[in-house]
Amino acid sequence: MALSSRLWRLLPLLRGAEQSVCQLARSWGSGGRCGTWGFRGSEVTGNTRAFKRGLLFSALSYLGFETYQVISQAAVVHATAKVEEILEQADYLYESGETEKLYQLLTQYKESEDVELLWRLARASRDIAQLCKTSEEEKKVLLYEALEYAKRALEKKGSSFAAHKWYAICISDVGDYEGIKVKIANAYVIKEHFEKAIELNPKDATSIHLMGIWCYTFAEMPWYQRRIAEVLFANPPSSTYEEALKYFHRAEEVDPNFYSKNLLLLGKTYLKLNNKKLAAFWLVKAKSYPAHTEEDKQIQTEAAQLLTGL
């Protein structure tokens, strides 16, 4: 429609230009010299056809460019609509706990450069790796695959909080295959990306929760790992249970009951701080959390065991 309207606007100009050329030819047809440039009538008359051909060629070139623009814009709109449709399907499958179907859907677009697709691919690959039926060999491949998707997402758009979050998660996951030195060194990178994700989106409870896990992990680091870290690094990463608790509570304030593991870790952190009353409060909430995923079921079991110990 846009191209047709442009064509109709252009045609009167072409007809007007053609008439002007013919008028010039007739007025200068006496053979006398005319105007500053001194054209002879015969020269103008002789070149009329060539001029019209040139004008027509220019018009067609213009229309070709206009066609290209319209088609390109339509292609972009179509591609954007298609990506949004895929994302809607992906989010529905994720919320429904359809881990394998989600992975099958997204891997069809693994060559995409869309950041929203890429970080979801990282998440889906990681979720498949976490399934009980996934072999250790397959798990390793999937975790490195997830890291590659997250890395591409981050390279594509450094202002995406989700790309920072999943890049940090995936680096943490592959740490088990990299050795203690690399794992500790990566801790600085992981913390940096979690903090960046929180900065970019302070309302994302998951990023805040993950920062809490980072603190909890280094607060309970075994003494021998701490000793290795002190040997390898002048300032090894460290944290406290109090700091971890702060992040877990902050995540809960942003989005109450958003994640069963956050409830569990609130209980476990209070246990580490010898506050059994508050530990029991949060462990009961974790045990009662509706089990939508395999992880939720595992958390229910762990919470029940910890409550029995109390």
Curated annotation (Swiss-Prot):
TPR repeats lie at residues 168-204, 222-258. The modification N6-succinyllysine is found at K165. GO terms for molecular function: microtubule binding. Its main location: cytoplasm. Pfam families: RMD1-3 (PF21033). The keyword Repeat applies. It is found in: Cytoplasm; Cytoplasm, Cytoskeleton, Spindle; Cytoplasm, Cytoskeleton, Spindle pole. InterPro entries: RMD1-3_a_helical_rpt, TPR-like_helical_dom_sf. The keyword Methyltransferase does not apply. SUPFAM superfamilies: TPR-like. One of its GO terms (cellular component) is cytoplasm. PANTHER family: REGULATOR OF MICROTUBULE DYNAMICS PROTEIN, REGULATOR OF MICROTUBULE DYNAMICS PROTEIN 1. Interacts with microtubules. Belongs to the RMDN family. This is Regulator of microtubule dynamics protein 1. The lineage of its organism: Eukaryota, Metazoa, Chordata, Craniata, Vertebrata.
